[in-house]
Amino acid sequence: MLTGCQKESTITTVQPGDKNTSEGSIVIADKTFDGLNGLVFGQITASGLKSGTLGTCPSITATLTTSFPVTITFDWGTGCASADDGITRSGKITASVSGMMNMVSSVLTFTFTDFVSEGNKISGVHKITYLGLNTGNNWPRYSIFTEAKIEFPDKKFINYRAEYIRLHAEGSATPLIIADDVWRIEGKSSGKTREGINWTASYPSAVVKKASCKWFSSGSVLITPEVGPSCIIDYGDGTCDNKATLKIEDKTINIEL
């Protein structure tokens, strides 16, 4: 049985950990939910919460009432691939917005309806709260809370819980231009692998996600499973590519995201 961080002695370039392992779980979960964060932030900014259908994949409909909350529906129907990240999704997400997302304490809450991303069914709680401007650099600051289940086609699943701070490090001054956005992600997460092994994770250095890039481009994640050695995923030096390293004890393995 594969349990914690998987140690290899001969492989030099591999996929980002077997999906049964703790590092595989966090790569899948972080990718899934950060992709949704990027999508929602982009469309809310671009739409200005105006009523109407605003996209094709997904179909995006914003319903504006005379007062908050308002709702935005993202509908992938029976399935389509996003032009931004190439990921095929199906089903629906409804985002309820309690107030303008530049007002402190406004909350955006996701509801999942038969939502599937890359073949995996997603359910649970996902919330984004605006905390105001960060002290020192005035970056917009958001709290991200997730408690979710990711179910695979074979009906096995992983549990994932995350509490992050998402900082809008670049691009907040140009709200209608999404491509120049850069986000820094800090926090902690925990979960249970497909094989029932608990793990926790922290971020020794903030993970950076550029809107112009499909992958995390820098930062690191320290993963500690309840069984086996800890490991670190290092996303690199800022270059936009699908490469990272997995460090387990004295071994460093190149991985492809």
Model-based region annotation:
Residues 6-257:
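Low-complexity, intrinsically disordered segments exposed to solvent
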